[in-house]
Amino acid sequence: MAAFMLGSLLRTFKQMVPSSASGQVRSHYVDWRMWRDVKRRKMAYEYADERLRINSLRKNTILPKILQDVADEEIAALPRDSCPVRIRNRCVMTSRPRGVKRRWRLSRIVFRHLADHGQLSGIQRATW
């Protein structure tokens, strides 16, 4: 009896709480590669100012060589993932690393599929 009451209570509660319009949840990343890239982007953003200042000291030829060497050691002490070179553009739907259209952040395969089915506004196939 208690299980029946609990089930009916949950059903009524579920009907009262509005769900999202599409029913899709987009709070997770596609795979671990995308999550790793997101962490790298965050770290590169955090260390961007510090890295810029240290690199300007390293590349300044007017400063003494000893100071440039100290700046080299400081840049080497920073985390590897703080370097923006390690960031890779990935498709937001499939996490594919190659053939990504930068403007839409989609791989060429997903982009073509969505464009063919009219799901990208303003995009249509060329006809001549």
Swiss-Prot record:
A single cellular component GO annotation: mitochondrial small ribosomal subunit
Keywords annotated in UniProt: Disease variant, Mitochondrion, Primary mitochondrial disease, Ribonucleoprotein, Ribosomal protein
InterPro entries: Ribosomal_uS14
GO terms of molecular function: RNA binding; structural constituent of ribosome
Localization per record: Mitochondrion
Record Pfam families: Ribosomal_S14 (PF00253)
Gene Ontology biological-process annotations: mitochondrial translation; translation
Record note on quaternary structure: Component of the mitochondrial small ribosomal subunit (mt-SSU). Mature mammalian 55S mitochondrial ribosomes consist of a small (28S) and a large (39S) subunit. The 28S small subunit contains a 12S ribosomal RNA (12S mt-rRNA) and 30 different proteins. The 39S large subunit contains a 16S rRNA (16S mt-rRNA), a copy of mitochondrial valine transfer RNA (mt-tRNA(Val)), which plays an integral structural role, and 52 different proteins. Interacts with LIAT1.
Family note: Belongs to the universal ribosomal protein uS14 family.
PANTHER family named in the record: 30S RIBOSOMAL PROTEIN S14, SMALL RIBOSOMAL SUBUNIT PROTEIN US14M
Disease linkage: Combined oxidative phosphorylation deficiency 38: An autosomal recessive disorder due to mitochondrial dysfunction and characterized by perinatal hypertrophic cardiomyopathy, growth retardation, muscle hypotonia, elevated lactate, dysmorphy and intellectual disability.
Protein name: Small ribosomal subunit protein uS14m
UniProt organism field: Homo sapiens
